[in-house]
Design a protein with these regions (language model features):
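Bacterial N-terminal signal peptides that target proteins for export
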Residues: 1-11
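Domain-scale selection of a single, long terminal region
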Residues: 2-4, 19, 85-87
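Subset of outer-membrane beta-barrel
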Residues: 23-276
Length: 276
């Protein structure tokens, strides 16, 4: 009997995974918080900024850890799993970010070492050195090193602007000229009219593809609960989710809906290792 799930996975392998093979390492979704908000995350100033804009790590006061997983289009074969650790010091914040995408027959790995520092009040820069690996058992493995840079700044009283570039120097992942690590630029702004509301918009440009627009809204209903929604274009995708705040522990649950491929559920657990 034909297994339709396996057929769908095969289709996704050719039309989704293989294009990603030529885009190894591009920034992962900024946790379930980012997934819910259309990944309009270049202005985040929490542990999730380890995935979207390292400059945001400069504003952390406590050592923090997060783990995030998403199952793209409900297929285990194209799941993505990430973890990050940030350690603030008087000299700046040091970070480690890890990501695994795929399954045993095709997978990509990313290891990033980050540093962020607040230069002036509300103005910070960040940088990360990445090792990117791709493994296909039948063809072997390949790995390259690249880097990413970010900046954030307060604009007026209630605005944050952010910019981040991944792999500014285009590097070939393999000897095949097609397998190039892409350059991706994200620029965004967040408006915080109150302490409970965040409105974020962002423009993302992969230098090989059409630019995409992303936007998200976060509303802290009560101290223990936040509500989130978001949208994105190219491809059209809608997101929604919640954040549960339990002292030092945050639990984020989200889902995104792709116009053709369906749902992507995701969840994050974040923990402040010091403080309250």
């Amino acid at each position: 009997m034909i297994n339709t799930k396996h057929i769908f996975a095969l289709i996704c392998t050719f039309f989704i995974i293989l294009p990603l093979f030529a885009q190894n390492g591009t920034p992962t979704v900024a946790g379930a918080r980012g997934l819910a908000m259309g990944d309009a995350s270049v202005t985040f100033r929490d542990i999730n900024s380890a995935f979207s804009n390292q400059a945001g790590l400069a504003f952390l006061d406590e050592m923090s850890f997060t783990a995030f997983g998403e199952q793209r289009f409900l297929l285990a074969e194209i799941g993505s799993y990430s973890a990050a650790l940030a350690y603030p010091t008087k000299s700046g914040t040091f970070g480690l970010a890890l990501n695994y995408f795929g399954y045993e027959n095709f997978n990509e790995q990313k290891i990033g070492l980050a540093y962020a520092r607040e230069l002036f009040d509300g103005v910070a820069i960040g940088a990360q050195v990445d090792y990117l690996g791709t493994r296909i058992p039948e063809y072997g493995s390949a790995g390259k090193v690249t880097f990413e840079l970010g900046v954030q700044a307060n604009l007026l009283e209630n605005f944050i602007v952010g910019a981040h570039i991944f792999s500014p120097v285009r590097t070939q992942l393999t000897d095949d000229e097609i397998d190039v690590i892409p350059t991706q630029l994200n620029v965004g702004i967040a408006y915080l009219p109150t302490e409970k509301v965040t409105l974020a918009i962002e423009l993302e440009k992969d230098f090989d593809y059409t630019a995409s627009f992303k936007g998200g809204i976060e509303y802290q209903l009560v101290d223990e609960l936040s509500l989130r929604v978001g949208v994105g274009t190219n491809p059209t995708q809608n997101g929604f989710g919640i954040g549960i705040h339990l002292g030092k522990l945050d639990i984020d649950i989200a889902a995104a809906y792709h116009q053709l491929l369906g749902f992507t559920p995701g969840a994050s657990v974040s923990y402040n290792l010091s403080g309250t």
